[in-house]
Amino acid sequence: EITTRLVGSEMCIRDRAMPYIRKFSGETIVVKYGGNAMINDKLKSAVMSDIALMRLVGVNVVLVHGGGPEINAMLKAVGKESKFENGMRVTDDETIDIVQMVLAGKVNKNLVQLMEKHGGKAIGLCGLDGNMLMAEKLVTSADLGYVGEIKEVNPEPLQNVINNGYIPIVATVASGYDGNVYLSLIHISEPTRRVVIS
């Protein structure tokens, strides 16, 4: 009886999911994954498991991630204070080096490893790879330093990764038109389908 109930429950979930699977199979969805949602290991595992499942049923997923808490921890470890203006990180010369190391290194590779653990094939990238994300310095009333706004996306590296059956996991570090590296603000606009986890 228990087995029958479980099988019935799984069939019910599958039946409810099928219209969405049919609708989005072959589509590309961008998942924006904020650093605060990475603090809870159980939640992080659930997110990776869900994305691996989406890929398995034919949905192409691009995971774009931040990592604010990890950046804060590294800055604290080197004796540097995290500074913010209007909720945005003030990013000077030393901070952008740490941001790049943490986001494109530690956080990105940890997510790749976790995705692989949950059955997804993943490749870690950052916006610098193939000039995938191009940014301009964000101009606000306060000088935020190396904080940029994405102005252009080169989809070719992402498409190559997806076409080879992998999930691209992208750190939000971007190339500047001025030759600098920027911590990028990600605004995912239509017609790109999106899911935001923050």
Mark where each language-model region is.
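Short, active-site-adjacent cap segments at secondary-structure transitions
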Residues: 37-39, 69-72, 130-134, 176, ...
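Single conserved hydrophobic/aromatic residue that forms the stacking wall/gate
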Residues: 1-8, 186-197
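Ligand-binding beta-strand-loop-alpha-helix segment within the catalytic cores
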Residues: 76-167
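Metabolite-binding pocket within alpha/beta catalytic cores that recognizes anionic/polar moieties
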Residues: 23-118
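Active-site loops and adjacent core secondary-structure elements that bind or stabilize anionic groups
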Residues: 11-12
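Catalytic-site beta-strand/loop segments enriched in glycine and acidic/polar residues
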Residues: 32, 161-185
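Charged helix-capping and loop-helix junction motifs
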Residues: 44-49, 183-189
